[in-house]
């Protein structure tokens, strides 16, 4: 049996997908990962085979740096960093405006490459990152059964009257003004409609008889998997999801790091672990505020 895993060329996306695939590996099955060159070392470390697939312009092997991105993507990354300095709404607005170029980059080309990979690998099962829209177009276009994995918070898959990119809830301490949120929703609704039109145009190219989508951000695969604990998800929202399975957290084993072990052993005090993710970690000012706190 062969499992095909399709992931963007970002370590943060690949790690949980690769961890999920260890269940197949433990049974002696073959695992093939379709992703880019930047995360090749991650694929090899898990003991998997790799098929080359470029789902977007950017990549992140673990630590993201604008100067290591291709032309155009470097400026986009710097623009996003600048937007985070202006606040949460500014960051969300920046992401919304870049969404089509980001998530549907070279949509038909990516879709056809995915179809070619499926033809070469002949997988018995396929799991794909929910945000790999170009890859999912390829699978849907060729009617390849697949599991669609939502890696982040479940709101990455919109339900009900939610609009992608417009958080349905906010922490009280940082909730923006109602006017800002209203403007953000209008922007995100426009992006949703444009994105869905792009999705439908690509899908029609790939399979003319396919049913067009009303909201591409709400589309799911044959099996929906959520990398999130069911106990932490609002029951009202769970009731609106299509058939699904909550996976909990993708906990993986990693080799012990002697340098980290020595650092921890040198001080018997409590340790607070603050995980900001790749993008906020590129903000020295944010790190400087977090450390004293």
Spans of model-derived segments:
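N-terminal subdomain of nucleotide-sugar transferases
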Residues: 1-58
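Generic beta-sheet signal
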Residues: 6, 34, 53-56, 147-151, ...
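Conserved nucleotide-sugar donor-interacting segment of glycosyltransferase catalytic cores
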Residues: 63, 97-179, 231-232
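Conserved nucleotide-sugar donor-binding subdomain of glycosyltransferases
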Residues: 69-133, 179-215
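Active-site-proximal region of nucleotide-activated glycan assembly enzymes
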Residues: 145-233
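Donor-nucleotide binding loops and adjacent catalytic segments primarily
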Residues: 227-293
